[in-house]
Amino acid sequence: MKRTPLILLFAALLLTACDPGYTMEFAIDNQTTHAVTIQSLQPVDTVGHTISRLTPLSAPAQTDTVVWVTGGLGHASINIIAKDIEWHNYGDSVQLRFDDGRALNYYRDSTGFDALYRFEDANADTSLYRYEAIVNQRPPFKGNARYGKLTLVITDSLYNLSRPRP
């Protein structure tokens, strides 16, 4: 009988000390009338190490498609998904290729005409993506987000920046 309060105290400490899990999604909201494919431009670095494991991601015209899901211990954060996308999937540059042969390149830490969006930097041109964090109210004493979704929004104005490419 004396063990019951001790077991309850131990269970309460265990529940409050646990680092809960989170889920992050990366989606493409293609608002154009063209299908789009995202592909890595530099799958290996200068010494031959593979830096991109990305197979091309495709989004049909006028769809909102979840293309990648990750998770782990801790809480959802835009920085987590942005870093995971760059370092684990894209490498340092990607190309958005539309079904009519037009394309737009994005390079990390570049300021050129085609470098309007940097996947590793949450502050780079926020008009191109949106981030949503949902706070799980259970347990009530933990207010961190358990779910996050980063959506790359491809609009007609972005399509108009693209150029014909071979």
Give each language-model segment a name.
Residues 1-18:
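Sec-dependent bacterial lipoprotein signal peptides
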Residues 18-25, 39-166:
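Intrinsically disordered, low-complexity segments enriched in small/polar residues
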Residues 26-30:
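A short, amphipathic beta-strand motif
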Residues 33-38:
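Short acidic/proline- and small/hydrophobic-mixed sequence motifs that coincide with surface turns
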